[in-house]
């Protein structure tokens, strides 16, 4: 019962945030410079008649009050009607459907690659604490966090195209962007896995398993893997959302026809309906992914369920008794 209430509460939070994002997008577009009528007519205002201008404004509803315009905007949004592009005259929804798959493919591929690399490296770093393997992994992680993604992308692009003379669309528009985005994400997950595992290795349950004669592999799989990976889920929600925003730079760097590329191209041409659609897509995706991550954490983490059943229990109360000697 407590879980259902908490899930409903998080879903209500998501609806409120989506409403705020939609309203802010409407306000920002109204405050943006330029006149959409000029863009639609593709002519200077001085070269068209007043009747044409007024007819276009009536068609767009620009003569209505801001409150009425906002109401029409929200009503159209609920019906997935984002208007038509000023440039191509195509529905914005259709344009987003054409550009979104490559962005989602790169983002989820980055997520899978990051998990496959970072979880084993985090475990190795924790098991070889303060040895040369741990130090090398920590140095690489620090460098990956410190260097901006676009700088790493430029270096990879230079190495592949100039030094290795490789001309491949799959390499330049898929593999290299995934590697570029994965490096920074891997660094955060490695640090989280390493710190969680170091703490859990000192827990009483691990000491008891060792006293029973269990080998280290059994302890890792049965006692440590789940509590080590569970804290990654909220981080993945945040990281996946930031990946969508990060693709704006990466897609333009590698010339990938995704949402980020579409957004920058629309900003240059002042195609306001498409800009609105891109901003809403990114905002909605981030909110929905984080909500799903919260719900998964709630369903899989016993600590969260215990805290919901008894609010007096603090969320930071460990379910595994940990000794006071913790490794940094």
UniProtKB/Swiss-Prot annotation:
Q: Membrane spanning segments where?
A: 11-31, 104-124, 139-159, 170-190, 229-249, 279-299
Where does this one sit in the cell? Cell membrane
Q: Name one GO cellular component term.
A: plasma membrane
Q: State the Gene3D superfamilies in the record.
A: MetI-like
Among CDD domains, the record links this protein to: TM_PBP2
The family assignment reads: Belongs to the binding-protein-dependent transport system permease family. OppBC subfamily.
**What is the protein's known function?**
Part of the ABC transporter complex NikABCDE (Opp2) involved in nickel import. Probably responsible for the translocation of the substrate across the membrane.
Name this protein carries in UniProt: Nickel import system permease protein NikB
Q: Which organism is it from?
A: Staphylococcus aureus (strain MSSA476)
Q: Provide the gene name from the record.
A: nikB
């Amino acid at each position: 019962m407590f879980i259902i209430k908490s899930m409903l509460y998080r879903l209500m939070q998501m609806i409120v945030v989506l409403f705020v994002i939609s309203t802010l997008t409407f306000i920002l577009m109204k405050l943006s410079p330029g006149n959409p009528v000029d863009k639609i007519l593709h002519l200077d205002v001085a070269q068209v008649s007043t009747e044409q201008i007024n007819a276009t404004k009536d068609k767009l509803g620009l003569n209505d009050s801001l409150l009425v315009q906002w109401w029409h905007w929200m009503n159209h949004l609920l019906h997935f009607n984002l208007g038509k592009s000023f440039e191509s005259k195509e529905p914005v929804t259709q344009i987003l459907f054409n550009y979104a798959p490559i962005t989602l493919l790169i983002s989820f591929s980055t997520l899978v690659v990051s998990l496959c690399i970072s979880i084993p490296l985090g475990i190795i770093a924790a098991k070889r604490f303060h040895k040369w393997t741990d130090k090398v992994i920590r140095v690489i992680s620090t460098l990956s966090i410190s260097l901006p993604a676009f700088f790493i992308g430029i270096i990879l692009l230079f190495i592949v195209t100039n030094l290795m003379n490789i001309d491949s669309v799959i390499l330049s528009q898929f593999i290299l962007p995934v590697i570029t985005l994965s490096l920074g994400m891997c660094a955060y997950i490695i640090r989280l896995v390493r710190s969680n595992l170091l703490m859990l290795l000192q827990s009483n349950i691990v000491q008891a398993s060792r006293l029973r004669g269990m080998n280290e592999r059994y302890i890792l799989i049965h006692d440590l893997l789940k509590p080590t990976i569970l804290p990654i889920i909220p981080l993945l929600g945040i990281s996946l959302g930031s990946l969508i925003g990060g693709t704006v730079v990466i897609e333009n760097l590698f010339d990938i026809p995704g949402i980020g590329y579409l957004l920058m191209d629309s900003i240059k041409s002042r195609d306001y309906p498409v800009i609105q659609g891109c901003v809403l897509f990114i905002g909605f995706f981030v909110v929905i992914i984080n909500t799903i991550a919260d719900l998964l954490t709630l369903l899989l983490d016993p600590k969260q369920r215990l805290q919901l059943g008894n609010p007096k229990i603090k969320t930071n109360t460990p379910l595994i008794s940990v000794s006071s000697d913790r490794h940094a």
